Amino acid sequence: SSTETPPSYNQLNYNENLLRFFNSKPVTAPVELDPPKVESSYVSSARGEDARSTLSPVQGFEGSGGSGSSGNFTTGSNLHMSSVTNTSNAGTGTSGTGNSGDGGGGGGANGTGSGAAPPVTLTESLLNKHNDEMEKFMLKKHRESRGRSGEKNKKSANEAMKMLEYSGPGPGHGHGIKRGGSHSWEGEANKPKQQLTLNTIGGGGGGGVGGGMPLFLDITHASSSSQNKGLAGVGVGGAGGVVGGGGSGTGLGGNGNVGSGNGNNNQPSTNQYTQSRLPCTQNINLWPPFSVGITTPTSVLSSHTAVPPSSFSPQHSLFPTFYYIPASIAASSPSSTNTNPNRPHKHAHVHNSSEKPSTSQAAAATMPLQYMTGVMYPHPSLFYTHPAAAAATAMV
């Protein structure tokens, strides 16, 4: 039987029915049709049990044998009918007179057992009634067993769900959950990088034209933060200088002050930057999420120096964008006597020339040209582009 349809009583009790039937040896035919070899004591005891079978059809199958010892073979399947069980099964019918004892088991019927009493049919009504009662009982037990198994399954499922809830999806586990390294843009993992970029990149070795101007710093704080000693070949005007090459420093020495390599911070270039009040902020996120790198305007000389791309220090996620910022001529350092309009080239070295800035360049130097932060301007060509033309193309 399937789990959906409850099994019938006959299916549940099939083996017990077979054992009970063959062990009880019932008589279902009249005595006249019995074979003559049947003993009289067996017939009389069977008739007496037929009379007692009005109480329950089970008692009709009990007490087979004239010796008086009633063999109760159905105790296992009739536990709930113990109150109806005939208690006087021990009969005295050994004389063959048909007196097999009175049926005082609660039914009140006296089994006279005379030879003229017709046998009671056991198969149609009484056995059907008994089967119905037993079927209800067995179905109840079956439902209880199924209910217990269902509760066990539910408990196990609930425990599994609770274990999943308690364990929880940790960092890096599960689908659709942000991994542990992906919060570096907004978490604390990016702060040390910003601090290193904002503080340690100072002037790296003096001697450059306007060397020592710190990269990616607030221009208004240049007087205080440019005193940091820069890293080797990183600072402005250093050995591998980013802006304003040609310095004689090794990248390790010098305070990186604006102007001369070791002079004080009193050069007019700094005053020009501080007075111009460029729209810069101090807290600049150099690694913004999902962006092409946005850089701040760096210090460019009055001769509009264009820096080759290969001279940039490897800053991750920074796009090589160039800015032209007009500035006054800083003639304090030794190398600034000859202004050198450096032109962008494929090689890392910078061509120095002794050309003087033309009148157009001087006019462009005085133009009030400012660039907005966060806006990417077009890349200059390999040939020299005049700042006025570059500004015109940028404004378009």
Curated annotation (Swiss-Prot):
Q: Which UniProt keywords apply?
A: Biological rhythms, Cytoplasm, Nucleus, Phosphoprotein, Repeat
Annotated phenotype, changing residue 201 to S:
In strain: O11, ABM, A28 and C2
Q: Where in the cell is it found?
A: Nucleus; Cytoplasm, Perinuclear region
Q: Does the keyword Nucleotide-binding apply?
A: no
Q: Which InterPro entries match?
A: Period_circadian_regulator
Which spans does this entry mark as compositional bias, Gly residues? 93-114, 253-262
Its cellular-component GO annotations read: nucleus; perinuclear region of cytoplasm
Where are the stretches annotated Disordered? 27-120, 167-188, 253-275, 333-362
List the biased-composition ranges (Low complexity): 333-342
Outcome of mutating residue 207 to V, per the record?
In strain: C2
Chief place where the protein resides:
nucleus
User: What is a single molecular function from GO for this protein?
Assistant: transcription corepressor binding
Q: How is it modified after translation?
A: Phosphorylated with a circadian rhythmicity, probably by the double-time protein (dbt). Phosphorylation could be implicated in the stability of per monomer and in the formation of heterodimer per-tim.
A GO BP term, please?
A: entrainment of circadian clock by photoperiod
| Described function | Essential for biological clock functions. Determines the period length of circadian and ultradian rhythms; an increase in PER dosage leads to shortened circadian rhythms and a decrease leads to lengthened circadian rhythms. Essential for the circadian rhythmicity of locomotor activity, eclosion behavior, and for the rhythmic component of the male courtship song that originates in the thoracic nervous system. The biological cycle depends on the rhythmic formation and nuclear localization of the TIM-PER complex. Light induces the degradation of TIM, which promotes elimination of PER.
Subunit and partners = Forms a heterodimer with timeless (TIM); the complex then translocates into the nucleus.
Q: What is the official name of this protein in its record?
A: Period circadian protein
Q: State the species of origin.
A: Drosophila paulistorum (Fruit fly)
Gene encoding the protein: per
